[in-house]
Amino acid sequence: LAGRSGWQVTVGLAEGEPRTADALANRERLRALPVTVLPRDTPPDPQAWTVAVDAVYGTGFHGTLRPEGQAACELLHKARAAGALLLAVDLPSGLTADTGEAAPGAVRADLTVAFDSRKPVHADPRAAEFCGEIVLADIGIPESCHRV
């Protein structure tokens, strides 16, 4: 969306080239968009960023950050320290969705965009300092899916 809106978008692949079928399919979708994908050996310059988007890990994260993920989170922290808005996708990387525990080096976002609905971790007081402001994004899940 940002690229289509005229923003200059640069994407870094935190853990290298995709390996799973879903990741490979999304990589192909990315190639069709007006974005720059950094080569693995090209270090990005977080000082130049206006907005940094954390999409390193998702709701399945638990435990500790892998070295590549740790490096990506450190880069995001540098961007935030330089004045960039740090936006997390669904959940800041390094937070465990089930428990609210944060791994050392977990992302501290200014804004978290939660898909469809808040997750239990979003209400956990321990997660508040990592999530920042939380907003919901409608991704088209029918209301009937919310009924138990």
What do the predicted segments below correspond to?
Residues L1-A52, Y57, H62-P67, A128:
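A cross-family phosphate/adenosyl-ligand binding-site feature
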Residues W49-V148:
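YjeF_N-associated NAD(P)HX repair module
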